Regions:
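Class I SAM-dependent methyltransferase SAM/SAH-binding core
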Residues: 50-112
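Short amphipathic alpha-helical segments
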Residues: 101, 241-244, 252, 256-272
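Short Lys/Arg-rich basic patches
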Residues: 220-247, 256, 265
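Conserved class I S-adenosyl-L-methionine
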Residues: 1-45, 60-64, 94-95, 151-176
Length: 283
């Protein structure tokens, strides 16, 4: 995350970042407060719950999240930049002291979060993960600290792929090369459930949402296929043997058809008989 640290941990970083946000929402003709409320709603949190915000910047997403978790809820806001977290904490203490007790600010690396497993009800990130040294690890850490059933919402620059080869797409990528990046959907943990991929702000920012789960999708791989080939998902995946000639394959298919069975069942039977004969000979 050296790129993020170099960019945002300077005396002028807070003003530069706020200037960028003002430009961003003006450019896409979006009301920032309304937009952030809509993004926070994707977390599906309820009053009294605990939310983690990684890459919190100046804490601009916190008001919308606090509105959802209510006076008994908590927000833990993390950023790599000390300048950002100090400024954000100072603003909350000065402007909203009655709510500041609900917020914990910390400076640290989002790739190694200092939290136990499953301690949050949801996790949120907007506008920084593209610069992480390891995007997949950033996703994995949010997944780790959120309880099963909790929601993770992550968003950053990346124009929709259907726009990349248009004049619009070339214009926005020329303005900011990060908008040329792909949504890192392949970086999700294998256990991610209820996954949603979309785009916001002129389709120039991708949004990935998923529910934390403790297992990969459920299925029964042993249900037999009906028809000529037969077998199951499991046998087709794990039971492949050495290749045979096309002529031998045709002979097997014809033999299975004459026997009124699937190719899988015919092969299982033929191989079992052959192995039995071999074992008898060895005795």
């Amino acid at each position: 995350q050296r790129a993020s640290q170099d960019m945002y941990n300077t005396e002028a970083a807070c003003a530069i970042y706020r200037n960028f946000l003002d430009w961003l929402f003006a450019t896409f003709e979006a009301d920032e407060a309304t937009w952030r409320k809509a993004m926070a709603a994707r977390l599906r949190v309820t009053p009294g719950q605990k939310v983690l915000v990684t890459g919190c910047g100046l804490g601009d997403d916190i008001p919308a999240i606090l509105e959802l978790v209510g006076p008994e809820g908590e927000v833990h806001a993390q950023d790599l930049s000390p300048a950002m977290t100090i400024e954000a904490a100072s603003r909350w203490a000065q402007d909203r002291p009655e709510q500041a007790r609900q917020i914990s600010f910390s400076t640290g690396n989002a790739l190694r979060l200092p939290f136990a497993d499953h301690v949050f009800d949801a996790a949120f990130h907007f506008g920084g993960i593209n610069l992480f040294d390891d995007v997949g690890q950033g996703m994995a850490e949010m997944n780790r600290v959120v309880r099963p059933g909790g929601r993770v919402v992550v968003s950053d620059e990346g124009v929709g792929p259907w726009l990349k080869d248009t004049d619009f797409g070339r214009m926005v990528v020329t303005n900011n090369r990060l908008w040329g990046l792909e949504a890192p959907i392949r970086k999700l943990p294998a256990t991610a459930a209820d996954v949603v991929l979309g785009w916001v702000l002129g389709n120039c920012f991708w949004v990935i949402e998923f529910t934390v789960s403790d297992a990969t999708p459920r299925l029964n791989p042993h249900v037999p296929h009906k028809g000529r080939r037969g077998g199951t998902m499991w046998t087709r995946h794990r039971g492949l043997l050495e290749a045979v000639t096309p002529e031998m394959r045709e002979k097997v298919e014809r033999a299975a058809a004459r026997a009124g069975t699937s190719v899988h069942d015919w092969l299982e039977s033929a191989l079992a008989k052959r192995l039995e004969q071999t074992q008898d000979g060895e005795r």
